[in-house]
Amino acid sequence: MFKIVCGKSARLGVWLLAMVSLAFAQPPRRFRGGSPRMDSIQVADPKSDLDLASFSPDRFTFVRVVYDSQGGPGEAYYPGDGEWRPRWATDHPDGAKNLTWRLNQLTTIRANQGSLLLRLTDPQLQDFPFIFMSDPGWQVLSEAEQKALRQYLSNGGFLWVDDFWGEAEWKNLEDNMRQVAPSWTWFNITADHPIMSIVYPLSECPQIPALQLYRRGGETYDPPWIHKQPNGGIPDVSKVNFRGLHDERGRLVAVATHNTDIADGWEREGDDEEFFQRFSVKAYALAINILTYAMSN
């Protein structure tokens, strides 16, 4: 079991100050392009950005799940960074690249730089204790993927699902997980759960919007019209839901950060100083709590 350099409780403030002072001491940034062409739909095929030259099996590896989604433009894939991107690739690659860089910089967690992209049916998945799934509002899982995910979680693996908004997108995840394990139950993670204070004391899961949408209106939630319909309107997306999934033994096998985009806090940390100070610091604190819990329980 690894330890974190910074201590608990009051020492969170020291860490926050360190984060602010290091706001622009970052890995290289990549250029972000404009909107993709609407008359020629070509979906990008993102690749793993793991630094294989320095990869070590003894280090933490951020594994992002590759999956299929239903629908067309704006559904199965969306415009971003000048191209059409599949839902599973939301916040990739900079999200995990920055998170693993910060883990190495600020904690004693030794992490491989970048992320590894795997499908649920890839045999390699069983070699890693943690997997991350983004933007699953339109996700579809095959029977083989359902079986593989249940096997992974039953064998001690841990899943984090992030960045999906509104009741319709929650229901899609809930329905998929019901196919994975019908008897497993979701519950609300409250401030007294150990995951909220295992390293840094947090009173709640922060709500983090996509940076480009935050710049438009200053709200902490994404506007409901950009997500899966019907979504119930603004009240449906303005409240964060931080939920956990228990297996039949009562073990926490998955967490879901719903109505928030935690990974955007990592991805966009160097794009806007106000966004960094208001959102990125909290995004890293929650991530370290979740990863510490996942790796030690």
Predicted segment positions?
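Short alpha-beta junction capping motif
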Residues: 62, 130-170
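Surface-exposed patches in mature extracellular/periplasmic domains of secreted proteins
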Residues: 109-119, 161-166, 184-192
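Short, well-ordered loop/turn elements at secondary-structure boundaries
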Residues: 126-127, 154-155, 248-250
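Aromatic-Pro/Gly-enriched surface loop or interdomain linker
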Residues: 26-130, 136-137, 261-297
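An acidic, glycine-rich "communication" segment
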Residues: 32-37, 42-43, 70, 76-77, ...
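Hydrophobic h-region of N-terminal signal peptides that target proteins for export
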Residues: 17-25
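Bacterial N-terminal signal peptides that target proteins for export
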Residues: 2-16
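Stable alpha-helical elements in mature extracytoplasmic
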Residues: 95, 99, 145-148, 169-177, ...
